[in-house]
């Protein structure tokens, strides 16, 4: 799905769907990342090529590379009215995609009205289970950032059936990751594209605008909630802390 954004009075079509301001989103993280967020008043933006998922920013699988290049060749051939397409043009397309991937910094959120057990297990599993989630809305996130950045939904696709173009690649993921219901922020360096960019960037935020409430892992011990409350107090952030509702006792 696509939407439009307005920049300096000009309307541009996006290659992603933009969540409405009242869309509920969550940021799940371990305690260290939570403390870093509070200490720096900034979101940690990971470079796209540093994610564990090797398909982050990919246009196709390696085994489909020949077919992908043939499709590119066909596209440019039509564009050039049947003239021979220089090999360099195809190479430049791949270089442009790798450069954009290397200069894109991402921060990922989960979209949903309720908590996700799958996300808790990703970020707060193990013996200590010291995980934290921030609940907010897309509108609050925009206000907290205070400047224009790209915020959009991920579209989950089957790479054996469709390939994203260079602009779409960072807004597409494999269908196996659909459980993430991801909304992401993307920024690029202000200085422009570089072949030697920083490994991460920090995006300043207003914490009181950003955080609606804080939740602690359903696997965490009861004392952990008090620890999180003390940490918030230390950084002068007055927000409610809840123990995850997924730990409620069942009646049979």
Locate the predicted segments by residue.
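Partner-binding and oligomerization surfaces adjacent to conserved cores of proteins
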Residues: 1-252
